[in-house]
């Protein structure tokens, strides 16, 4: 029997690596697909409840009008800034991956650091937005609202899980689902961004210590980049379906 016939295929365990990629990147794709299905379920549920309560469902352009250190009426400007920041961090991640392909350690460190900063700014911005959404931004903690069909001044308690100031029916019964979905969807996505920042910090540390130089490749950067781009892409859908529509 020839030596060629005895040769085993190079790859992992049972055969040649499928799709011409490493098992690490393949499993990352599996994870991202399953995670995408979770976000899809949340956004579909949001659409269902929005349709069911369309008569009292708040208009996001009238809800998210705040901006730090000002009292101006700026619909979605702050959320737009958050979106721009996250997209910009995706660009810096692309540059970090490209530097990894060139085995440019300094380039990887620079662009990963900027990606970390961008992600941290987004998380901090979301914390501020949550605080305003929960506690309210009106002076005196009072707000005009409809109670039993009559406009009157009522205590202002913010839009928390037990009370939704923005969705009040003509019977005075509040519909808290807007706040429920706001905390659930943005919180779940925010957790992903926070996790990504932590992973990016770990990656930066590994690059600084020369781990990838010793390995001879920067594939880890590519896998982290896939996750970060996924998080950015999901936010585009969240921004569109929750804030714009």
Which role fits each region the language model picked out?
Residues 1-245:
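...captures the hydrophobic TM-helix bundle architecture rather than a specific catalytic motif
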């Amino acid at each position: 029997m020839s030596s060629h016939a005895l040769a085993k295929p190079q790859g992992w365990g049972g055969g040649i690596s499928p799709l011409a990629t490493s098992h690490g990147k393949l499993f990352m794709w599996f994870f991202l697909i399953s995670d995408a299905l979770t976000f899809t379920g949340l956004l579909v549920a949001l659409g269902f409840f929005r349709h069911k309560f369309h008569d009292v469902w708040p208009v996001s352009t009238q809800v998210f009008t705040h901006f730090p250190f000002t009292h101006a009426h700026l619909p979605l400007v702050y959320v737009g800034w958050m979106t721009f920041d996250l997209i910009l961090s995706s660009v810096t991640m692309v540059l970090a991956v490209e530097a990894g392909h060139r085995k440019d350690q300094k380039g990887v460190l620079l662009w990963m650091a900027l990606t970390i900063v961008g992600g941290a700014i987004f998380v901090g911005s979301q914390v501020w937005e949550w605080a305003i959404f929960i506690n309210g931004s009106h002076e005196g903690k009072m707000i005009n609202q409809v109670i039993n069909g009559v406009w009157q001044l009522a205590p202002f308690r913010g839009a928390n899980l037990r009370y939704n100031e923005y969705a009040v029916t003509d019977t005075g019964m509040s519909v808290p689902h807007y706040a429920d979905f706001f905390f659930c969807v943005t919180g779940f996505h925010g957790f992903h961004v926070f996790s990504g920042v932590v992973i990016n910090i770990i990656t930066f540390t590994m690059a600084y210590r020369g781990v990838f130089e010793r390995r001879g490749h920067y594939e880890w950067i590519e896998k982290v980049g896939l996750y970060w781009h996924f998080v950015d892409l999901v936010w585009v859908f969240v921004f569109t379906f929750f804030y714009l529509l």
